[in-house]
């Protein structure tokens, strides 16, 4: 019963904040939880969901390459600017930090509760999004802003 109330509270907060992603995610979890197969489905989503999400984001990121909007010329150009080097460095940093984070979660599963709560708070109240590769872009943006190197398009 507690999990239903917790999810309902998250849904209410998401609705009040008008956060479409969290509304959809919570609604999907509530529907899945109501299904007779939830005991089989939810653990699979818990174990594999982050990887599936990263895959979907990766596909979206690769589409400009597939459509020809980004090619080797743009890749080489990225390495000619401080912003490009910072972006590559942030990508590497996030990958390393993520590996350390996975290790921490394996050693301290109770951290998941704090991370989930913090993520919900950030998504709902600070208009953030729960994503991995996008974090690298956010860190890059922060560093570029500090050094006044934000590319203007």
UniProtKB/Swiss-Prot annotation:
Cellular localisation: Cell membrane
Keywords of this entry: Cell membrane, Membrane, Transmembrane, Transmembrane helix
Membrane spanning stretches: 4-24, 52-72, 85-105, 115-135
GO CC field: plasma membrane
A matching Pfam family: DUF441
InterPro entries in UniProt: UPF0756_TM
Entry membrane topology: Multi-pass membrane protein
PANTHER family in alphabetical order: UPF0756 MEMBRANE PROTEIN YEAL (PTHR38452:SF1)
Family named by the database record: Belongs to the UPF0756 family.
Listed HAMAP family: UPF0756
Name under which the protein is recorded: UPF0756 membrane protein LCA_1031
